């Protein structure tokens, strides 16, 4: 029981996770970051259900959340030296004896038949000798523990990498091709596919306990997509989401190690808000409004702009 009571404050004191400002990577990525971003992107794109587009020619429109920005992660890894430190200092007793010289002064006073003699002894105000004696033992003891691990956590500036968007777009096109869906210019397409990428970036965090420490890097990709038939304006694919995250983590003990390194890829939580529950207004008069009914036999008029593009005019 006593051991448990001692461990509770040791584990709970000075605990916390320092999370860096989320950013979209950039600059020259290191290999682990490249691997994580690629893994989350591939997993999210691979999850897209494109079965309704089999055999179709699709025009692809990809829109990615702005990925420009910067942030600093500052502060060093804490040292346990400030928590465990003690010292003992002992000085011997010291006594000093001063020897001051003495001198006698004699004064004689005479008046007629009377006379007096006065004698006095005085000390000089400066010692003639000094003797210092020390008694007892002198000792000094100190104890401490300093663990700095791999040193301070350096400042880092995260910049934008425009090639990330191009990489993600190429992944989507690759999946379309492998699924048997041809991606063509808009003027030759019979289907419009819209992909909105809401989250596409990395998050760094650091966990610090007295005995356990961890460095974690996550990459997240979250997107929403839907498809519309060019002629009928029907929704071939209602709005759907795909979200995945990959993680790289190093685990330390007193910032020594890492004793464990792990990589994982898993489905992430979905978008906080999506468009899967949006339907057209019932009283709309728009000619080209989306048709949410499947196989209803209706074929709304195609707008003039669509006809013009069909004819190549």
UniProtKB/Swiss-Prot annotation:
Please indicate which superkingdom the organism of origin belongs to: Bacteria
Bias kind Polar residues: ranges: 282-297
Which cellular compartments is it found in? Cell outer membrane
Lipid linkage positions (S-diacylglycerol cysteine):
15
Membrane topology of this protein: Lipid-anchor
Spans annotated as Disordered: 282-313
Please provide, in alphabetical order, the Gene Ontology terms of the cellular component aspect for this entry.
cell outer membrane
Indicate the secretion signal residues: 1-14
* Single GO BP term: cell adhesion
Covalent lipid adducts (N-palmitoyl cysteine), residues: 15
User: What's in the keyword line of the UniProt record?
Assistant: Cell adhesion, Cell outer membrane, Lipoprotein, Membrane, Palmitate, Signal, Virulence
Of which family is this protein a member? Belongs to the MafA family.
Please report the name of this protein according to its UniProt entry.
Answer: Adhesin MafA 2
What lineage is this protein's organism placed in?
A: Bacteria, Pseudomonadati, Pseudomonadota, Betaproteobacteria, Neisseriales
Q: Which gene encodes it?
A: mafA2
């Amino acid at each position: 029981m006593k051991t448990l009571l001692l461990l509770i404050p040791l584990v709970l004191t000075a605990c916390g996770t320092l999370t860096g400002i989320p950013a979209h990577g950039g600059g020259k990525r290191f290999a682990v970051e490249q691997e994580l971003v690629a893994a989350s992107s591939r997993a999210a794109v691979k999850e897209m259900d494109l079965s309704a587009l089999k055999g179709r020619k699709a025009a692809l429109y990809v829109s990615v959340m702005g990925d420009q920005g910067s942030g600093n992660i500052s502060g060093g890894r804490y040292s346990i030296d400030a928590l465990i430190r003690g010292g003992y200092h002992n000085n011997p007793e010291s006594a000093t004896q001063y020897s001051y010289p003495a001198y006698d002064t004699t004064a004689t006073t005479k008046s007629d038949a009377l006379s007096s003699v006065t004698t006095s002894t005085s000390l000089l105000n400066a010692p003639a000798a000094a003797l210092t004696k020390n008694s007892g033992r002198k000792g000094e003891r100190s104890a401490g523990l300093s663990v700095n691990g791999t040193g301070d956590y350096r400042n880092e500036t995260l910049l934008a990498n425009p090639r990330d968007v191009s990489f993600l777009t190429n992944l989507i096109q690759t999946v379309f091709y492998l699924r048997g869906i041809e991606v063509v210019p808009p003027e030759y397409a019979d289907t419009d596919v819209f992909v909105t990428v809401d989250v596409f970036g990395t998050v760094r965090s650091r966990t610090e306990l007295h005995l356990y420490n961890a460095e974690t890097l996550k990459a997240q990709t979250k997107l929403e997509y839907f498809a519309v038939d060019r002629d009928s304006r029907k929704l071939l694919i209602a709005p759907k989401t795909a979200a995945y995250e990959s993680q790289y983590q190093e685990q330390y003990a007193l910032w020594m190690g890492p004793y464990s390194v792990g990589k994982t890829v898993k489905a992430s939580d979905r978008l906080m808000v999506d468009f899967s529950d949006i339907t057209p207004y019932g009283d709309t008069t728009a000619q080209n409004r989306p048709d949410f009914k499947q196989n209803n036999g209706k074929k709304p008029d195609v707008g003039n702009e669509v006809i013009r593009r069909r004819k190549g005019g």
